[in-house]
Amino acid sequence: SASPSRPEAPAEAAPSAPAEKAPAAEGPAEEKPAEEKLVATYAVTAFTQDSIRYDVSSGDAVVTGCADSVTKLVIPETVTYDDKEYKVVGIQEHAFDWANHRSLALETVDLGGLPLEIGEYAFRGQKSLTTVTGMDNITAVSDYMFTACSALTSVADLSKVTSVGIQAFMNCSSLTTLEGLNFSALTSIGQQAFNNMKSFSLELGEHTFDSLEFLDIRAFANTAGITGKVVLPERI
């Protein structure tokens, strides 16, 4: 007899594909920061005001020269540029040196009674320069400051000077007056400081250089107008 037929196994259902995730809802777009505009700024280091040149790189003003047309130089206490005020604190070395400014012909200089630091050779060889005033708060006449200013007749207000540098007044052949200079207060006199001042005369009497600590060679050479008996401290 025929064998009973086996029931067919139910067909396996094909595995269903995983459900696709719905894309996440997009949030508000991030705002990009506004682009910064670069603005170039430049620090002022030098400028010219009223025909006088200044360096202000240190934060204060130092005089570095002037226009060749200037004959009467007056140093101000302060100077303003681009809405900023600077205190005038000094005069740069060689600022008015004839060797660097051969067309400049200064006649008078007024330092305004300011406590300036004045560099070497500041006025050397200014052959038209006749008078210098306003040195009330200057304590040192720097090396070669007035060397060969042959028309210079008077330097005033030297009462606070304690140091006269190398050749400071050498070959100032017309100089007759160093107003207020107290030789008793000088602590240092440089080499040839007063050499060849042919028009200068000073009667010292019996004079002691009480404060003097340094006296270099030929300090008073060829300056016959200084007379008297000079007494030097034993430490010299």
PLM feature segments, named:
Residues 51, 58-60, 68-90, 101-117, ...:
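Structural signature of tandem-repeat unit edges
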